[in-house]
Amino acid sequence: ATEQPAELQPQLPDDLFNAYIASQMALAGDSYEDAQAALEQLAADGSGELQTLAQAAADAEDIEGIRAAFISLSDEVAEASLPEGYSLAFCPMANNYQGANWVQEGDAINNPYFGSAMLTCGSIIKQ
């Protein structure tokens, strides 16, 4: 028997989703301060696991720490239905070559795990 795909959770509220996307864009742009501010907003407005993961990322002492914590946060966000125009992307080199997902706007890769060093590394896996 084949496994049925898990039911997607409803879309995140706009304020939470927008704060996540702001943090993803800030990481892709190599901005620790902007990423931290967006994650603080996500932690303040969120609840449960999303709040815990966002706060852990916001509390990181440097951009590498935020990027490491962003992996689990992105997995949590990816469990929800995505608004139209957003995609789930994957970089095979992130997370010490174990790979990592993230949600982003559009289908032009904007890698939050490597920023300008490898901004376009990855592929869209779901739109």
Predicted features, each with a name:
Residues 1-127:
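Intrinsically disordered, low-complexity terminal tails/loops enriched in metal-binding residues
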